[in-house]
Amino acid sequence: MERMPAISLAAVPGRRSATLDLAVEIEKKGFTGIYCPSLGDSMALSQAIALVTKEILFGTSIMPIYFRQVFDHASSASFIHETSKGRFRFGIGVSHGPALKAKGLEGGKPLSDIRSFVSELKEAPRVGELPPIILAAMRKKMIALAGEIGNGMVFANAARSHMQESLDVLSASTKKDANFFIGNMIPTCISEDVEAAKAVNRKTLTSYAMLPNYRNYWKEAGYVEEMEAIEKAIEAKEFDRIPHF
């Protein structure tokens, strides 16, 4: 049997209990992991998953560092780590400007903020043992930082054609470390109608293409022409053209 992928799982109001039932089913089906995006409360969902599952690995992917105080993050992460018997991975990131603005928050400098957060997290007193810390990374400086201070990293929508170049910034020892986690969240639509599936994914990726961080990554990955065309469409408020690119 081929290795099963991990699944992204979010809990929305009114369906939280059903989501936990689904987590149990995901484990029974043999999937390799459950990762909770920043949609909703990924820490609360992870805490519940720790208690309803037995063996599957799971984690946040990601928990924005600005949403809570560092000590609160450390306490919750340690609790989940302990109650899951080490199955939890604490994925963190800076999120995106529009998402922070919607919550009345303002981000800072991604690299220095992540470095400070991880340092303070590890120094938090009397919280207990911490889980592996996974950094959300897209571009090379954050990837290098993950290799320096983290236990892994997670991409989102990363191009396979650019992956080798991205990973080349890691040290040889980090690349060989089986405990260093490398993940890539990929929106997936399964259908016998290939064109319909493509249309769904284009619609899904449109929201990512609206964000500067992703466009900058895709430019680095070689899609300069497409990203510049999208930027022109955004500037002209011709949003319906974005899926075309």
What are these regions (language model features)?
Residues 1-245:
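Active-site-adjacent structural elements that line small-molecule/cofactor binding pockets in enzymes
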